[in-house]
Amino acid sequence: MYLEVPAAALKATVKVNGVEAITHEGGFSAFWADITDLCHAGDNELVIEVGNENTPTMYPASADFTFYGGLYRGVNLISVPATHFDLDYFGGPGIKVTPKSAMDGGAVFVNESYVTNSDENFTVQYSIRDADGHEVAVAVRPADQTAVTLYVPQAKLWSMDEPNLYTVTARLQRRNETWDEVTTCTGVRSYTVTPLESFILNGQPTPLRGVSRHQNRLYKGKRPDRC
């Protein structure tokens, strides 16, 4: 059993039945806590202590706006089998997808997965679908931490005018039975930064204009809706 906290400002300590499970610093990144061994049959007490005290070890250390405290993106309980995509891997979903455009107009997707308590009977199936839901690439490999590369012909690039996305699904399987599944979306693009042309997106100069916009709302703080 995992507890997912998408964001807690600015420092959070998770306790289950009075026992500390994890302490996380930083109010803008998600984190997971494995609370399996701290739970028992019947009722359990879950406490998340959150504080927004200004300390030099957490960003931002000082600014001209208020550092609100609290849970502003909700909290989720996630139940997974004993063998699952690793939720303890740097706060991610257990998979990493890196798309790269190819010279022939296609794209390669470098896929990596991280599985907990795996053995030789487990495999990971990768499936890539375009914006219309059509499967454009698929591959199966053993459930270890080696990467697998999938090729998508005539890939549509992501840009600000045409934000094309691909959906990558990883299924953890054992003898054709799915044990765990995660899905992520990604776009194919290339970018460089040069002194003369500044930011280059997909080979085209692209002006970057920053906007000073805070997510805070009157009487609501960082949370736009009731939590």
What does each model-identified segment do?
Residues 1-88, 118, 131:
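Accessory beta-strand-rich segments of carbohydrate-active enzymes
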Residues 1-5, 9-17, 22, 82-95, ...:
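Active-site-adjacent substrate/metal-binding segments within catalytic domains
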Residues 27, 102-107, 142-146:
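Ser/Thr- and Asn-enriched, surface-exposed coil loops between beta-strands
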Residues 29, 109, 122:
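Exposed loop/turn and edge beta-strand positions of beta-sandwich/beta-sheet ligand-binding modules
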Residues 39-43, 112-195:
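Extended acidic/polar, glycine-enriched regions
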Residues 82-118:
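Surface beta-strand/loop "capping" patches
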Residues 108, 163, 222-223:
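Flexible, substrate/cofactor-facing loop regions flanked by secondary structure
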